[in-house]
Structures are given as C-alpha cells and as structure tokens.
Amino acid sequence: MAGQGSVRLTRKSDNVVIIEKDLATEEMVLSMGPQHPSTHGVLRLECRTDGEVVTEAEPYLGYLHRCFEKYCENVDYPAIVPYTDRMDYLAGMNSEMAYAIAVEKLLDIEIPRRVEFIRVIVSELNRIASHLVAIGTYAIDLGAFTPFLFCFRDREHILNMLEWASGARMLYNYIWIGGLAYDVPADFQKRVGEFVDYFRPKALELSRLLTENEIFVKRTKGIGIMPADVAINYGWSGPMLRGSGVQWDLRRNDPYSIYPELDFAVPVPDGKFSDVGDCLSRHLVRALEIEESLKIIEQCIEKMPSAEGFDPRAAVPKRIRPKAGEVYARAENPRGELGFYILSDGKSTSPVRCKARSSCFVNLSAMKDLSKGQLIPDLVAIIGSIDIVLGEVDR
C-alpha cells in the first residue's frame, strides 16, 4: 500500500478539522478493543483510517454497564455508598464523598469538623494514588516501563494507609452519610506526615523520568490538542479542562467541605514546555496536582481537631427519609467533576431518582474530535491522556 505522504491539519474557526494529504489510500475500518491493553478497560473504538491517518474514531460503550442508577432506586440511601465505590474504583473515597455531600445537602445536616478533615485527607490520598495509576499506565502505554514500577511502588504505601483507616484497599465504604464508618487510628496523622516527607522527592523524581524522556515528549507534545473553548463546550472538567488552559477546579471555584480554609494552587500549562491542550499538557497537570494534594494533606494534619470525645457516627442518621425535594451536588474527583442529582418524594427511604454525572463519560465524548487527523499510534497517547475508568463511563 502506498504511503500517505505528508499530512496537514487545519482547524477552522467553527472547529472543523480539515485533513490535507499529498497521497490518499483506500479507507479502512479497524476495531480497536474492547480487549486491547491501551483502551484501559472494555472500550471499543471503531476507527476509519486513510493509510496511517485516522479520519474518525467512534467510541462504543456499555460493556461494563451495571445498572447503577436503577439499583439506587431499589436500596436505602446508605446502601448506595458501596455502589459509588464501584464506579471510579481507583478513587472510591472521592466518589463516596461526592455522594455523601449530595445526601447531606438534601437532609440539611451539619458534619463534625474532624470528619471533614479526615474526609479530605483520605480523598487527597486517593487522588494521589489515582494519578499514580494514570501516570504509570500512560508511561507503559508509550513504552516506558520503569515509571510504571515507581508509581505502583509508591501507590502501595497509600493503599496501606487507606486500608489501615478503612479496612479495605479498594471499595472502601468508609465515608458515610453524616460521618465515617470509623475514626482513624491514633497515630494516623504521624504516619501520613511521614509518607508526605518520603513521597515528595519521589514525586519529583517520577516527574523527571518522563518529562526529560525525549521519546515520551515526542509521543505526547502537539498530539490530541483541544482548544479551551471547545473543551468548555464539551463539558470537560478536571485535568482534561485544566490541560487546555482553563483554571477551573471545584475545590477552588465551587468549594465544599473545608477546602475554602486550605491553601493550594490550581496548576495549568503555560505553553513553555508543551502545546496548551495537548496530551503532554494533560500529563503535566496530573503530575503537578500531586504536589498540591501533598500540600493539602499537610495542612489538614496540622489543623485537624483532637479525637477526644469524638464519635465518627454522631451525625449519621438512624433512618434516612428526606423531605420531598431535589438536590445536585458535585465534587472534584481525580478525573473531573462527579455530580449526583437526587430526587426524593418525601415518603421512601430510597431515592426516586439518582443520576450520576460522570466526568469520564463527558471527557471521552470528545474522542472523535481529538483523534481526527492523528496517526494510528497516536490514538494510544490520546486515550491514555483522557485517563478513563470504564466503571464510571458505563456505570
């Protein structure tokens, strides 16, 4: 088959991408996934290609659909918490917190201060662990094996601490409506502080392993560029939106819990090292966010109230039957905004409707635009930069 020659991409003002090539070949339709290591789960992409150039990549979903929203209509409010763990199973604490905030808003109940601090600590630990998986698997997708080992080595320390606090390494069922399943162990703060001191130089070393790797930079810089206005129109959030240069983080722009009391930055690319909106920018945002999460954890350790006389279940309702009404609450998860819309009829102990707004689903919806005009090998870099979890996409 003849090569496609040089390829030129032109993005018009209405965001239509025009592909111009010196040579053309017969169009082929290739199926990538659902059993493919670089799709990070059971995702299938139907790719239309002209030689090595992708003209369209259509995602096909639903292979991991488990009826989450229907389950919610048939169980009590507290029984939904374990199901939220199984959406983004790499960031269960964050998902539990988003759901708990929604129901607590519906019930209009006040949460003890120590509970809020513990929630933020375990959520930020889970955020770091999730970003380590994203960075490690992204590296191995592009042929760099050592960073993968470094990421999973340090993630193990975090999982051990979360297991120490909650009893589980994943699928925690720890953040309850109104409180926590248990208080943290007596020297939890000391151990977390020691981890922060240990991990900060390791995070810098990990970042240098990739950003100073010429092959990694060439595989990601200028690939899968998404302009800020288009990202906003798609409804992107999290590192995907910030990678396009939009400084939007719910912890800062629509704060919840104790985040207004904490000092941290919202990193966005400046265009000096990467092309704003490309795969490399999205990777850099996740790497920089790890340091900000460490800052948040340090502040929480210093400010957390004493455990004297503390009952983690003091504000947990014995029976939950909210008054008739509806609520929407959202939180900044590692992959973006996770929101819950809950509708109560005032009679049942189960919600009439519980709708989950998944950041992974919304971010993945731009795959056609991201992939148009790219080379087939670059699809791997683009998918990895989105950092999807199919459990949350399909629900």
UniProtKB/Swiss-Prot annotation:
Location relative to the cell: Cell inner membrane
Domain of life: Bacteria
Cystine crosslinks: none
Pfam families: Complex1_49kDa
EC identifiers of the protein: 7.1.1.-
Keywords: Cell inner membrane, Cell membrane, Membrane, NAD, Quinone, Translocase, Transport
Catalytic activity: a quinone + NADH + 5 H(+)(in) = a quinol + NAD(+) + 4 H(+)(out)
Record-level Gene Ontology MF annotations: NAD binding; NADH:ubiquinone reductase (non-electrogenic) activity; quinone binding
Topology versus the membrane: Peripheral membrane protein
SUPFAM superfamilies: HydB/Nqo4-like
Main subcellular location: membrane
GO cellular component: plasma membrane
UniProt-listed InterPro entries: NADH_Q_OxRdtase_suD (IPR001135), NDH1_su_D/H (IPR022885), NiFe-Hase_large (IPR029014)
Group of enzyme by EC: translocase
Stated family: Belongs to the complex I 49 kDa subunit family.
Assembly mode: NDH-1 is composed of 14 different subunits. Subunits NuoB, C, D, E, F, and G constitute the peripheral sector of the complex.
PANTHER family: NADH DEHYDROGENASE [UBIQUINONE] IRON-SULFUR PROTEIN 2, MITOCHONDRIAL, NADH-UBIQUINONE OXIDOREDUCTASE 49 KDA SUBUNIT
NCBIfam families, alphabetized: PRK06075.1
Chain's role: NDH-1 shuttles electrons from NADH, via FMN and iron-sulfur (Fe-S) centers, to quinones in the respiratory chain. The immediate electron acceptor for the enzyme in this species is believed to be a menaquinone. Couples the redox reaction to proton translocation (for every two electrons transferred, four hydrogen ions are translocated across the cytoplasmic membrane), and thus conserves the redox energy in a proton gradient.
Protein name: NADH-quinone oxidoreductase subunit D
Lineage: Bacteria, Pseudomonadati, Chlorobiota, Chlorobiia, Chlorobiales
